[in-house]
Amino acid sequence: MRRLVRACYTGTGGYSYAKKADDVAREHGFDRVARLASNENPRPPSPAALEAATVALREVNRYPDERTSVLVEALRRYHGDYRFVTGSGMDGVIETVIRTVVEPGETMVVSTPTFSFYGIAAAAHGARVVNVPRREDFSVDTGAFIDACHGAKLAFLCSPNNPTGNSVPPEDVEAILEGMDGLLFLDNAYVDFADTDYRPLMRRYENLVIGRTMSKIFALAGLRVGYAFVPEWLEPFYQRAATPFALNSVSMAAAGGALADTERVRETRDHVREWRRRFLEEVPFRVYPSDANFVMIDVDPHTGDEAVARLAAKGVLVRSCTSFPGLGNHYIRVCIGEDWENIRFLEAIKNL
């Protein structure tokens, strides 16, 4: 019966997940493991988010608001008067945008190395992917990217980029928008940890979508809330393509509560920036400057897989970057965790 499965799924391994912390703890005899592999927020969600979620649980016998109106209003209070669409995590938003604009056989452009889901989702929808390698310093080759976008329906840029951590300068994004005919999806999953603000570009360009998530700085990864700034023309078509009731009532309520707690956001940002600085100063390998809640480290002469295994034996779970096309075999990605997790990592990496 395997013949019934679509070729795009039989010919690829799919999305690569980090090893489970419980498995590492059991394998190496630790009571707890430093979980630094998945770019999560180690702090619990805002009390306001938890309270709102608890209230929403009382009415889960009812279907959620398909228009996500309350969440959209909360987003406007937080960001200003933009148009928003929502989805089940950033992945859900990405997939819906692809489904909205890309026909099978049409071209999508991706700047690599980067988040692998763009290519996975493209393959699922029958799109042809053109990968544009980044420069040696992992900056975007703007000219090559624009050239690749000629005739393409959709392009993806991740800024700050996963896994390299660097941001694309707004002027480079603007040059790309000016030079391409299709739609640019700017993945801003980690932008809350950076100083760069791309939102003003939404006022000037009709071919820009900015994707965001509640999983990172807002600490709601388990509730899967994604959203995007979209131009007016795209919104009704996105809604037609979207999965019905993609966001549940509890997720939407929690997201609204988290958006209202701006002090929690500031505290989390400060925590991440302080530990990013310490990682840059104290890790005895090359650490790439990052605008995200993680850093990428070149662990040469070790491979990324070797470093992950050695750190796991010391009770630290990090991500090997060997699965990122175009990156090479000597990199790991380490997110900022709780203080004790970061301290354990620093002790472990110094004795790799």
Curated annotation (Swiss-Prot):
The modification N6-(pyridoxal phosphate)lysine is found at K216. Belongs to the class-II pyridoxal-phosphate-dependent aminotransferase family. Histidinol-phosphate aminotransferase subfamily. HAMAP family: HisC_aminotrans_2. One of its GO terms (biological process) is L-histidine biosynthetic process. It comes from Methanoculleus marisnigri (strain ATCC 35101 / DSM 1498 / JR1). Pfam families: Aminotran_1_2 (PF00155). Keywords: Amino-acid biosynthesis, Aminotransferase, Histidine biosynthesis, Pyridoxal phosphate, Transferase. This is Histidinol-phosphate aminotransferase. One of its GO terms (molecular function) is histidinol-phosphate transaminase activity. It catalyses: L-histidinol phosphate + 2-oxoglutarate = 3-(imidazol-4-yl)-2-oxopropyl phosphate + L-glutamate. Its EC number is 2.6.1.9. Its cofactor is pyridoxal 5'-phosphate. InterPro entries: Aminotransferase_I/II_large, HisP_aminotrans, HistidinolP_aminotransfase, PyrdxlP-dep_Trfase, PyrdxlP-dep_Trfase_major, PyrdxlP-dep_Trfase_small. The lineage of its organism: Archaea, Methanobacteriati, Methanobacteriota, Stenosarchaea group, Methanomicrobia. It is an enzyme of class 2 (transferase). Pathway: Amino-acid biosynthesis; L-histidine biosynthesis; L-histidine from 5-phospho-alpha-D-ribose 1-diphosphate: step 7/9. Transmembrane segments: none annotated. Gene3D superfamilies: Aspartate Aminotransferase, domain 1, Type I PLP-dependent aspartate aminotransferase-like (Major domain).
